[in-house]
């Protein structure tokens, strides 16, 4: 290691004698740069990057549809893990290119970066794609790619491998009714891991989102791959109501603050923009999200179009509050308004500018103001058309703002007035006992589970805190994020014992802190995040034995009017075997989707009653190294998690081998 920092005479001579000349300049031709540095073009070589290839080909097909040249797109996932995407548009040009007279335009597009029809407004007024490098990048990173173009009764086809041409352009006779472009490709395992394959669910959801974004297209879906999910083998995907249909499928309509969805679909020729949006507000943030798109391309990091929408909504609600004389509206922030909102925004513009090759953020100038003006006009009309609706919405977001302000100002909260001052979503349902001895706080996720738990509890000794907001991974977050996270703030205020060096055992308001999450994988994930919080922010609380995990059942088994419960698949199998040995009567098996699905009586009997439940006490054998252990498992470095999993797998494998009777 020290040799790295030594500077001896020999090395000095090498530096002096070393000739840095033209021959040292490496020139990568054609698609070589893509294969050598794929991360520069698709953001990496992981599963997300590999799925960018599908997005690019699908974006090209959608461009044909949005331009009015295609109405049908087919997506087929094959047994061999390749994928075919077809659109019935004009078909990629096959005549020779003026700049490259010995090559067809098709070959130029597939083998040359920054080529295509998207650079000319005469061809596409709006277009997506990876800055014009997309289809050539797909070709470069594919083990095999076959393209077929149907034009004027002819079929033109050509094959490629790793960006290199395998065959010349072949022309055959075809039906004159056929037209369009078909691309079949398989990602190159030399670039991506051999274990990586396309995820049918991810691609199906991508196809649905594209169909929502453009009402004039029908996507024909076919999946030959065996999947263990609710993804259909075949489907016709079409949504005549666009984003309104999309939002309706994502939310619970009976949980809305105000009835209906604020939606619009406007084309402004003066601003050269086509805009569609759909927004609703729910009573909690369980389905809160903001999704935006530009020219059907998702922009997960937002951008100027999102800025315009947010300004419109904020200005609109503040103006309405001022109009009706509600001075509290002046304190609103956009975070208050979007806290429980579900938002989808889509725009079509000419020559969009994105940040980065993978287009995750729109940075086009001149977009924010037109979007703001259009949505503001419609939002003002939406609010003024129904006074009761507008007032309910305003009061809802003001209550969120007041909660935010109160959390900032409050430092000491007693049990007596905790519920009133905290204004926790779903309310902190506190116990009536004033001393902490014998009391329990159940931490649950969301109002649904919280509602069942509140009815099932013993009101004297058991309190229920539904966490409102996303549970943060404390191990990989900055101090600023931790301090500002809503769920963590709610929890620290309810416990009242302080954290880190400020932890005071005597101020802890409950004897037992019980994490009660769903019995499935998602519930285990939330529980692990909460344990991470306690290990890193309140290690003394864990060391003193206050932290527990509840064990709710995952399955309900009914036989001959008797009900039994099982916590997991293994326990269910053993229980069924036992029941069938005792009786041949039919067993009905039900799976709980979550705590909120359980009746209060069931939740009390299985999970909350002190004499009938099972609790797991959370502890660590090595408290001195807790920071390192948690950082290895929950921190920013995935290689440490991989090492842990690998070591545990070896232990498990050794055990299995030792038990084999060979």
From Swiss-Prot:
Its job: Topoisomerase IV is essential for chromosome segregation. It relaxes supercoiled DNA. Performs the decatenation events required during the replication of a circular DNA molecule.
Subunit structure: Heterotetramer composed of ParC and ParE.
EC code: 5.6.2.2
Reactions that this protein is recorded to catalyse: ATP-dependent breakage, passage and rejoining of double-stranded DNA
CDD domains referenced in this protein's UniProt entry, alphabetically: HATPase_GyrB-like (cd16928), TopoII_Trans_DNA_gyrase (cd00822)
Site keyed Interaction with DNA: positions: 470, 473, 525, 641
Class of the enzyme per the UniProt entry, highest EC level: isomerase
Record organism: Rickettsia conorii (strain ATCC VR-613 / Malish 7)
SMART domains, A to Z: HATPase_c, TOP2c
Record has Transmembrane as a keyword: no
Toprim domain residues: 439-553
Top-level taxonomy: Bacteria, Pseudomonadati, Pseudomonadota, Alphaproteobacteria, Rickettsiales
Swiss-Prot/TrEMBL cofactor(s): Mg(2+); Mn(2+); Ca(2+)
Binding sites annotated in the UniProt record for Mg(2+) 2: 518, 520
Binding site for Mg(2+) 1: 445, 518
BP GO annotations: chromosome segregation; DNA topological change
Residue sites binding ATP per the record: 20, 60, 87, 129-135, 359
GO cellular component term, pick one: chromosome
Name the record gives this protein: DNA topoisomerase 4 subunit B
Any one GO MF annotation of this record: DNA binding
Keywords on record: ATP-binding, DNA-binding, Isomerase, Magnesium, Metal-binding, Nucleotide-binding, Topoisomerase
Domain of life: Bacteria
Co-factor: note: Binds two Mg(2+) per subunit. The magnesium ions form salt bridges with both the protein and the DNA. Can also accept other divalent metal cations, such as Mn(2+) or Ca(2+).
UniProt-listed Pfam families: DNA_gyraseB (PF00204), DNA_gyraseB_C (PF00986), HATPase_c (PF02518), Toprim (PF01751)
Family per similarity comment: Belongs to the type II topoisomerase family. ParE type 1 subfamily.
């Amino acid at each position: 290691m020290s040799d790295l920092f030594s500077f001896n005479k020999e090395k000095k001579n090498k530096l002096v004698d070393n000739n840095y000349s033209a021959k040292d300049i490496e020139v990568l031709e054609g698609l070589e740069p893509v294969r050598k540095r794929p991360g520069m073009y698709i953001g990496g070589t992981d599963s997300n990057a590999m799925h960018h290839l599908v997005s690019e080909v699908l974006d090209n097909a959608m461009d044909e549809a949005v331009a009015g040249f295609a109405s049908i797109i087919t997506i087929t996932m094959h047994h061999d893990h390749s994928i075919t995407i077809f659109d019935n548009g004009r078909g990629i040009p096959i005549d020779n290119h003026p700049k490259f007279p010995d090559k067809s335009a098709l070959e130029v597009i597939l083998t040359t970066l920054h080529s295509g029809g998207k650079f000319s407004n005469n061809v596409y007024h709006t277009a997506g794609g990876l800055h014009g490098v997309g289809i050539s990048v797909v070709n470069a990173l594919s083990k095999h790619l076959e393209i077929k173009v149907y034009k004027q009764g002819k079929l033109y086809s050509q094959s490629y491998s790793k960006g290199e041409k395998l065959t010349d352009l072949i022309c055959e006779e075809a039906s004159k009714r056929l037209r369009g472009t078909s691309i079949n490709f398989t990602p190159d395992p030399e670039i991506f891991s051999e274990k990586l394959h396309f995820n049918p669910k991810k691609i199906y959801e991508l196809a649905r989102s594209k169909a929502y974004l453009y009402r004039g297209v029908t996507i024909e879906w076919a999946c030959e791959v065996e999947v263990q999910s609710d993804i259909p083998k075949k489907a016709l995907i079409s949504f005549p109501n666009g984003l309104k249909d999309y939002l309706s499928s994502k939310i619970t309509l009976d949980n809305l603050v105000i009835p209906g969805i604020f939606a619009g679909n406007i084309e402004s020729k003066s601003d050269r923009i086509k805009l569609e949006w759909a927004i609703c507000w729910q009573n909690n943030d369980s389905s809160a999200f903001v999704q935006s798109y530009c020219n059907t391309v998702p922009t997960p990091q937002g951008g100027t179009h999102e800025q315009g929408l947010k300004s419109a909504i904020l200005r609109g609600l503040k103006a309405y509050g001022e109009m009706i004389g509600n001075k509290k509206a002046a304190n609103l922030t956009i975070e208050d308004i979007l806290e429980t909102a579900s938002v989808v925004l889509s725009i079509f513009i000419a020559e969009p500018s994105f940040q980065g090759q993978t287009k995750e953020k729109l940075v086009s100038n001149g977009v924010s103001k037109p979007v703001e003006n259009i949505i503001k006009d419609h939002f003002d009309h939406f609010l003024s058309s129904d006074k009761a609706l507008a007032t309910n919405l305003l009061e809802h977001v003001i209550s969120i703002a007041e909660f935010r302000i109160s959390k900032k100002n409050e430092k000491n909260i007693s049990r007596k007035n905790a519920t009133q001052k905290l204004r926790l979503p779903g309310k902190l349902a506190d116990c009536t006992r004033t001393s902490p001895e014998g009391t329990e706080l159940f931490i649950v996720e969301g109002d649904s589970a919280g509602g069942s738990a509140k009815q099932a509890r013993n009101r004297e000794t058991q309190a229920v805190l539904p966490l409102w907001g996303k549970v943060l991974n404390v191990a990989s977050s900055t101090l600023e994020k931790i301090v500002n996270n809503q769920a963590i703030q709610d929890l620290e205020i309810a416990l009242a014992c302080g954290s880190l060096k400020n932890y005071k055992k005597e101020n802890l308001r409950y004897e037992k802190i019980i994490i009660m999450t769903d019995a499935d994988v998602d519930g285990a994930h939330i529980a692990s995040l909460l344990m991470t919080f306690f290990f890193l922010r309140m290690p003394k609380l864990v060391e003193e034995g206050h932290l527990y995990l509840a064990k709710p059942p995952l399955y309900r088994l009914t036989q001959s009017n008797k009900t039994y419960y099982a916590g997991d698949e293994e326990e269910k199998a053993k229980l069924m075997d036992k029941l069938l040995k005792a009786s041949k009567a039919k067993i009905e098996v039900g799976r709980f989707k979550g705590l909120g699905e359980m009746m209060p009586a069931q939740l009390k009997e299985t999970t909350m009653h002190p004499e009938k439940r099972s609790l797991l006490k959370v502890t660590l054998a090595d408290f001195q190294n807790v920071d390192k252990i948690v950082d290895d498992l929950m921190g920013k470095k995935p290689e440490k998690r991989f090492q842990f999993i690998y070591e545990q797998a070896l232990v498990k494998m050794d055990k299995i081998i030792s038990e084999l009777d060979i």
